[in-house]
């Protein structure tokens, strides 16, 4: 081989090595820092910059509903007063009724798609289990996302001009300007990002720190390569993500579907009156760490036989300390707030777990993790949206 050929081969080899080194940087996942906690805040939220010019808005993360909405500067009788100035829409933001995004949202919310009354806009109404509701129109605007190429996709979301409060609404909207609804659907933000090629897989996940905070990610690049327990997603549970029926080792057989959801008070709710319990010590308790040694881990078991999978729930994930120093079981009676036979795994149960919702393969996964740094990557820093 001539010296020129050898030199050219060496140059190509170096170029290939540089390309391989760059591959890990070409991620399609989007990571957001989570704020809030299970108690006493009662919600986890992300900050997103929306519009042109971009303005910050805090969005309460809800994996049980498919609608993302902001409180708009056109209220009728809204009771919500968020931390930032209300979003101000323009006529160019309005999504018409015959738009595919409107069709998807109406389908996700179980609404009739009828454009005869208001063909120029996409109206919606959505009610939550706790009595909260949002009435509004669908808009589209730019979202500034923390990606390598600084994507600013045009995404559809709700402009809520009439919000009615439920049991938790007053507390939640002190911290939030709206809701980031990423429940199962075809018009939710994660689905839109996949459709626009911003992420390659319709997968998202979250990790909730036991002392608050954590992270949320969209896309499959941040899924751990090993150590994840997977179960199939149950069907026919609406917009909830569910691993199906489960057994909780509190001598409670949860024969009805279990929904995995980050919403409401972030406490787990099951259909059993016996679970609302509190205890008092001689002196008021200040921290869960002071009493967790007196409790044993619980287990949630899904499936049967070879397909059986178990999630261990340490004491710090199912007990809470109240402001008055009582120790309470953080598992509430869901039938009292209209959940009927649906049991919800709340944010408290999922603390210090990375939870993965894989819509590509219709499965849910979890793994124990530190929620203050990404697995195998640099420590988590706040997202600059």
Task: Show where each model-derived region lies.
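C-terminal reverse transcriptase regions that engage the nucleic-acid substrate
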Residues: 181
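Signature of the N-terminal lobe/flap region of pepsin-like aspartyl proteases
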Residues: 32, 39-155, 159-168, 266-277, ...
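Short coil/turn segments at secondary-structure boundaries
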Residues: 72-74, 170-171, 194-195, 219-220, ...
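Aspartic protease catalytic domain
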Residues: 2-14, 18-19, 28, 35, ...
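Flexible, small-/acidic-enriched active-site or ligand-binding loops
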Residues: 217-263, 326-327
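Residues that flank catalytic or metal-binding motifs in active/ligand-binding sites
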Residues: 44, 66, 139, 153, ...
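Acidic glycine-/aspartate-rich tracts in secreted/extracellular proteins
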Residues: 74-76, 149-150, 186, 222-223, ...
